[in-house]
Amino acid sequence: MSSGGLLLLLGLLTLWAELTPVSSQDRPKFCYLPADPAECNAYMPRFYYDSASNKCKEFIYGGCRGNANNFKNRAECRHTCVASRKGIQPRIASN
């Protein structure tokens, strides 16, 4: 196969991988943790992924401890944990 053909094949495979629907197995495990507001005195609106509804929901974070299912905004939560119907795969957040 020519180098042009290989490049075309690589491009098609990459496109296919991006458009393939996501299964819950591709979601990071911390997305399944419950919201953990912690018991400190801060009042920080945050978002967590709710696996029962496949949605990111707001909660109030106390500012200490907690777990990794804690995002500063809804967009970050969605990008990391929500299985999109459009086939965009979630990614592991780098906190």
UniProtKB/Swiss-Prot annotation:
Similarity-based family: Belongs to the venom Kunitz-type family.
Positions bearing the site annotation: Reactive bond: N41, A42
Tissue: Expressed by the venom gland.
Record function comment: Serine protease inhibitor that inhibits trypsin. Exhibits an anti-tumor effect and displays integrin inhibitory activity without being cytotoxic. Is able to dose-dependently inhibit the adhesion, migration and invasion of human glioblastoma U87 cells. Also impairs the function of alpha-v/beta-3 (ITGAV/ITGB3) and to a lesser extent, the activity of alpha-v/beta-6 (ITGAV/ITGB6), alpha-v/beta-5 (ITGAV/ITGB5), alpha-1/beta-1 (ITGA1/ITGB1) and alpha-5/beta-1 (ITGA5/ITGB1) integrins.
Pyrrolidone carboxylic acid PTM positions: Q25
Protein name per UniProt: Kunitz-type serine protease inhibitor PIVL
Cysteine-cysteine disulfides: C31-C81, C40-C64, C56-C77
Subcellular location: Secreted
Matches recorded under SMART domains: KU (SM00131)
Taxonomic lineage from the root: Eukaryota, Metazoa, Chordata, Craniata, Vertebrata
Note: Negative results: does not inhibit chymotrypsin.
GO terms for MF: serine-type endopeptidase inhibitor activity
